[in-house]
């Protein structure tokens, strides 16, 4: 048996003015054929899980196309057209396959296609026909659509946020594919779409209220005939009609068991919905709280979420830390121009910089400050442990670490980087 592997992943923030272009995929992952195997086979990613699951079952994996970009604005129409044309050219070139393992994100948006994932999955189904299995994974933040459900035999969502189980879900999808091809199971997929969206502040799966919801799902997963249950939290930064939380269940045969567990799980979600309201505080309150806290403290600007597509050059927290003279404070800001100026000045030299706030005023205006250059780095680092997003190799571009006499240290980067790994800090001293 031969099973193809396809992936197109990007989390689209529709509130960002700039679009995600083809070069953003090239800077992250844009791979074809055996390059996918050599790059992803051992990764903490569902594609790595696809390879492992098929290999364990002695089924041939046929890697076809993989594209991934860091969360940012919507994918430009030209970029999406080029990506999908290449994907289906390579799919045709791969010849007859017994099934397809797919890894969409679930919250990708592009111009006339607010449901990119559903669009390309539907096109794949049209091309391969109803008799060829299509089984895949979804990011836990997917905005599930009926089109995605109808185009596939089974979709399996991550079970953890931060996303540490991507490889496991890939293995699970591959095992389900092989069992289906061997006639051992007959997956029947059902979904419900409650009128609800989880506040992103409350989406950690190891803390209340998500913890209890996911524990309940684990119990339901043990029911006879249930192959998979997924809680898709949704991505609130994609302002599309599909935006919202959804539940998926896959049963072995259409015996009503999937509908039953979905009814129970959706009832529990709905009855606890008030617990998912955000509890954020204003910036001044956050600063004042530092006077009462000892030890390390992490301040989160929920509107400047790089992992959710923000520009990464927000300055509101940095300005507040400087104003309040918070010693030994630290921020990371994407600013290629300021980084180059700091690198040109050299380690140990002081320079006046305008830092951040260059992509728009929503997340603050530039900071004008005199800083001393403490270090200059390549910006490349590796992570050996499973981390959110399945990344293992990182490149935030040339990096400069500078310090202001207020006590603030700033890591300046030439590429946007979400805080997925502590190696980002360790690699820069």
Where are these regions (language model features)?
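A C-terminal functional module that forms or caps the active site or interfaces directly
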Residues: 408-429
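Active-site histidine-anchored catalytic micro-motif
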Residues: 4-11, 15-16, 30, 77-84, ...
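Hard-cation-handling environments
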Residues: 201-407, 411-415
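N-terminal amphipathic/basic leader segments beginning at the initiator methionine
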Residues: 1-56
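Gly-rich Lys/Arg/Thr-decorated short loops/hinges at beta-loop-alpha junctions or inter-strand turns
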Residues: 30-32, 63-72, 103-105, 265-273
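Charged, often glycine-rich, active-site loop that binds/positions anionic groups
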Residues: 65-86
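Internal, active-site/partner-interface "lid" segment
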Residues: 181-210
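Glycine-rich phosphate/diphosphate-binding loops that line cofactor/substrate pockets in enzymes
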Residues: 55-59, 63, 89-100, 286-297
């Amino acid at each position: 048996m031969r099973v193809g592997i396809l992936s197109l992943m990007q989390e689209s923030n529709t509130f960002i003015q700039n679009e995600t272009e083809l070069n953003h995929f090239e800077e992250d992952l844009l791979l074809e054929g055996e390059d996918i195997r050599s790059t992803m086979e051992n990764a903490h990613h569902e594609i790595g899980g696809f390879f492992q699951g098929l290999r364990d079952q002695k089924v041939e994996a046929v890697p076809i196309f993989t594209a991934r970009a860091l969360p940012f604005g919507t994918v430009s129409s030209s970029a999406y057209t080029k990506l999908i044309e290449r994907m289906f050219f390579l799919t045709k070139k791969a010849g007859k396959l017994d099934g397809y393992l797919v890894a969409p994100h679930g919250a990708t948006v592009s111009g006339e296609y607010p449901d990119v994932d559903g669009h390309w999955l539907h096109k794949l189904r049209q091309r391969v026909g109803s008799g060829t299995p299509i089984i895949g994974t979804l990011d836990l933040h997917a905005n599930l659509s009926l089109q995605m459900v109808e185009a596939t035999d089974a979709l399996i969502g991550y079970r953890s946020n931060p996303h540490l189980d991507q490889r496991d879900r890939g293995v699970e999808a591959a095992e389900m594919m092989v069992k289906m091809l061997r006639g051992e199971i007959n997956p029947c997929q059902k979904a419900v779409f409650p009128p609800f969206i989880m506040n992103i502040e409350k989406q950690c799966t190891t803390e209340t209220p998500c913890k209890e919801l996911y524990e309940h799902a684990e119990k339901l997963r043990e029911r006879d005939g249930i192959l998979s249950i997924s809680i898709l939290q949704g991505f609130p930064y994609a302002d599309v009609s599909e935006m919202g939380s959804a539940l998926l269940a896959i049963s072995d045969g259409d015996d009503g068991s999937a509908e039953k567990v979905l009814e129970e799980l959706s009832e529990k979600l709905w009855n606890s919905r008030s617990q998912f309201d955000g509890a954020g505080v204003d910036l001044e309150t956050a600063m004042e709280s530092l006077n009462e806290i000892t030890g390390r403290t992490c301040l989160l600007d929920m509107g400047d979420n790089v992992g959710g597509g923000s520009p990464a050059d927000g300055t509101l927290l940095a300005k507040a830390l400087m104003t309040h003279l918070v010693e030994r404070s630290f921020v990371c800001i994407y600013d290629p121009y300021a980084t180059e100026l700091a690198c040109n000045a050299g380690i140990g030299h002081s320079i006046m910089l305008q830092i951040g706030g260059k992509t728009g005023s929503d997340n603050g205006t530039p900071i004008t400050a005199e800083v001393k250059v403490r270090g200059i780095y390549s910006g490349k680092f590796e992570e050996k442990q499973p981390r959110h997003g399945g990344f293992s190799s990182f490149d935030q571009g040339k990096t400069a670490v500078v310090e202001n006499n207020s006590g603030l240290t700033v890591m300046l980067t030439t590429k946007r980087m979400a805080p997925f790994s502590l190696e980002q800090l360790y690699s820069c001293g």
